[in-house]
Amino acid sequence: MPRQISDIKQFLEIARRKDATSARIKKNTNKDVKFKLRCSKYLYTLVVADAKKAEKLRQSLPPDLTVTEVGKKA
């Protein structure tokens, strides 16, 4: 089931949980970056409009989390 999160700190807390298995980063054409975090019960989504904040958030994800980048189709 999907859940949308608006707070970056809350997203990072969920990413550090034991049931967080993978994260997908999707960059849209309108400069939005979506972070999708797969946990056992929910798929959490965070939308970041600022590219610099998105890069900092990507670097602060836990290293044991599998991160996949999904870009625009060519």
Swiss-Prot record:
Coiled coil: which residue ranges?
none
GO molecular function terms noted in the UniProt entry = structural constituent of ribosome
Gene3D superfamilies for the chain: 3.30.720.90
Source taxon at top rank: Eukaryota
**What subcellular compartments does it reside in?**
Cytoplasm
Q: How does it assemble?
A: Component of the large ribosomal subunit (LSU). Mature yeast ribosomes consist of a small (40S) and a large (60S) subunit. The 40S small subunit contains 1 molecule of ribosomal RNA (18S rRNA) and at least 33 different proteins. The large 60S subunit contains 3 rRNA molecules (25S, 5.8S and 5S rRNA) and at least 46 different proteins.
Q: Write down the PANTHER family for this protein, in alphabetical order.
A: 60S RIBOSOMAL PROTEIN L38, LARGE RIBOSOMAL SUBUNIT PROTEIN EL38
Extra information: There are 2 genes for eL38 in S.pombe.
Protein name stated in the entry: Large ribosomal subunit protein eL38A
Write the lineage as a comma-separated list: Eukaryota, Fungi, Dikarya, Ascomycota, Taphrinomycotina
| The gene coding this protein | rpl3801
